[in-house]
Amino acid sequence: MAVPKFKPSKSRSRTRRSINMRKKIPQLQECSNCGYLVIRHRVCLKCGYYKNIQYLELGL
């Protein structure tokens, strides 16, 4: 069975794990109906549209 020859440094270990520590920023795009920034592939919470089809009736 293979055994590591040297102990990995803190820098190497933390660099490898750092990908999990990054903040995940949501992907935003403009609503095609009102121009409000919304998360991709979701209904716009301001106007209720997604891909020019109304899914929510909002009494604004």
From Swiss-Prot:
GO molecular function: structural constituent of ribosome
UniProt keywords, alphabetically: Ribonucleoprotein, Ribosomal protein
DNA-binding recorded as keyword: no
CC annotations in GO: large ribosomal subunit
InterPro entries: Ribosomal_bL32, Ribosomal_bL32_bact, Ribosomal_zn-bd
One Pfam family named in its UniProt record: Ribosomal_L32p
Source organism superkingdom: Bacteria
Alphabetical GO biological process terms: translation
Family statement drawn from the similarity comment of this UniProt entry: Belongs to the bacterial ribosomal protein bL32 family.
Protein name per Swiss-Prot or TrEMBL: Large ribosomal subunit protein bL32
Source organism per UniProt: Borrelia hermsii (strain HS1 / DAH)
Gene coding for it: rpmF
